[in-house]
């Protein structure tokens, strides 16, 4: 009887261990040319990706990290989110923050930070004017402008 229990236990362990798959965690890899890429599950990530809670812009063709991306409306929202997180702002909000582009022209992008508590009901916490050329954000309410790059 004891032998059957041991064999059953050994059989269970073998089946559990035999059915496990390696977990591929993501990792930053520096190429010979010094450029960085991020690989996850043996594939290069491309475009905008949140890695460990921070947004990174990775080239859409090569996956190479773009340290200072062009200031598009998407870049403005992602970089503003990174900076506000770094500054420790808006951490106690009950709802997830949203970043919405209100207005854009050739020189600036106006981004509102807020949340929705019901569908289509956006509560604005603050608005930031992003200078495309300088890469800075100037809050409508609060401190002076700060760099996003």
What are these regions (language model features)?
Residues 68-100:
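Short, non-transmembrane alpha-helical segments in secretory-pathway proteins
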Residues 124-149:
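A short, surface-exposed interaction/processing loop segment used at functional sites
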Residues 2-74:
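Extracellular adhesion/carbohydrate-binding repeat motifs centered on closely spaced tryptophans
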Residues 92-132:
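Exposed beta-strand-loop-beta-strand "reactive/processing" segments of non-cytosolic proteins
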Residues 51, 69-77, 104-106, 121-123:
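Solvent-exposed, acidic/flexible segments
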Residues 36-42, 49, 85-94, 117-121:
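Short, solvent-exposed secondary-structure boundary motifs
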């Amino acid at each position: 009887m004891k032998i059957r229990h041991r064999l059953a236990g050994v059989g269970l362990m073998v089946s559990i261990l035999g059915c496990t798959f390696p977990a591929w965690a993501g990792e930053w890899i520096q190429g010979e040319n010094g450029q960085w890429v991020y690989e996850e599950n043996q594939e290069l990530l491309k475009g905008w990706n949140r890695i460990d809670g921070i947004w990174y812009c990775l080239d859409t063709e090569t996956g190479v990290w773009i340290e200072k991306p062009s200031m598009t409306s998407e870049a403005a929202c992602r970089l503003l989110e990174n900076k506000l997180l770094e500054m420790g702002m808006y951490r106690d909000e009950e709802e997830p923050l949203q970043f919405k582009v209100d207005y854009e022209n050739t020189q600036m992008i106006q981004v509102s930070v807020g949340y929705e508590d019901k569908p289509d009901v956006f509560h604005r916490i603050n608005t930031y004017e992003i200078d495309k050329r300088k890469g800075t954000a100037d809050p409508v309410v609060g401190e002076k402008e700060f760099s996003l790059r």
